[in-house]
């Protein structure tokens, strides 16, 4: 597994790099924090670990840049205790968030869970689903409606796939959380809310935001 670790604290970087390499992860770091995207594009990571507080530009800036060109999973690290940092990271398309200090074994468990979730279908052939008058491409994380195409994050696509495969049925929040993360204890309820909100915002670009309905106190439903 190729990990790009964007961390300016060299002591922490070296400690994490050593721990991750013991699990056979190939870890790259950043030499010039003004050129993070250069390393990102040349290294082609399978997962990015991104610190919030960085020199020159913060992690949110680099997350936006990465999302312009890739759906690679991004896990944020932050020493700040502001809950809005977590909300912002989810809104920008991050897949997970950890606050410093943290247990390294928890980080490794999260990385392994993300990897399984995102890459378990990479060897499969193209898979598509028809939803209303749109075509959902599960292999490309995209939705095409007429001449318009939108792209989802891996997390958003998993949520949508669950809802579409149970069209016109209420899917509980717990069911979705269980499918997204291996250990529910590591997930806040707000994280799912943010991801669904972001999914609806993208669907609005192709006039499909009303296709997913919130059932208060129960969960969500995708209309056929």
UniProtKB/Swiss-Prot annotation:
InterPro entries: CheY-like_superfamily, OmpR/PhoB-type_DNA-bd, Sig_transdc_resp-reg_C-effctor, Sig_transdc_resp-reg_receiver, WalR-like, WH-like_DNA-bd_sf. The modification 4-aspartylphosphate is found at residue 51. PROSITE patterns: OMPR_PHOB, RESPONSE_REGULATORY. It is found in: Cytoplasm. The keyword Cytoplasm applies. The modification Phosphothreonine is found at residues 128, 130, 149. Keywords: Activator, Antibiotic resistance, Cytoplasm, DNA-binding, Phosphoprotein, Repressor, Transcription, Transcription regulation, Two-component regulatory system, Virulence. This is Response regulator protein GraR. It comes from Staphylococcus aureus (strain Mu50 / ATCC 700699).
């Amino acid at each position: 597994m190729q990990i790009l670790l964007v961390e300016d604290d060299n002591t922490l970087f070296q400690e994490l790099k050593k721990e991750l390499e013991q699990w056979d992860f190939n870890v790259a770091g950043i030499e010039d924090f003004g050129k993070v995207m250069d390393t990102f594009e040349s290294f082609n990571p399978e997962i990015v670990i991104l610190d919030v507080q960085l020199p020159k530009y913060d992690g949110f800036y680099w997350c936006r840049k990465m999302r312009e060109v890739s759906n690679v999973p991004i896990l944020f690290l932050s020493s700040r205790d502001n809950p809005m940092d977590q909300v912002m990271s989810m809104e920008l398309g991050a897949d997970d968030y950890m606050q410093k200090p943290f247990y390294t074994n928890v980080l490794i468990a999260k990385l392994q869970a993300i990897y399984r979730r995102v890459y378990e279908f990479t060897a499969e052939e193209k898979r598509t689903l028809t939803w209303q008058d749109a075509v959902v491409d599960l292999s490309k994380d995209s939705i095409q409606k007429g001449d318009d195409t939108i792209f989802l994050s891996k997390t958003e696509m998993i949520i949508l796939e669950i809802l579409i495969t149970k069209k016109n049925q209420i899917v509980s929040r717990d069911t979705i959380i269980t499918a997204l993360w291996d250990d529910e204890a590591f997930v806040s309820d707000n994280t799912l809310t943010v991801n669904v909100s972001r999914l609806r915002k993208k669907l609005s670009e192709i006039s499909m935001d009303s296709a997913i309905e919130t059932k208060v106190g129960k969960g969500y439903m995708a209309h056929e």
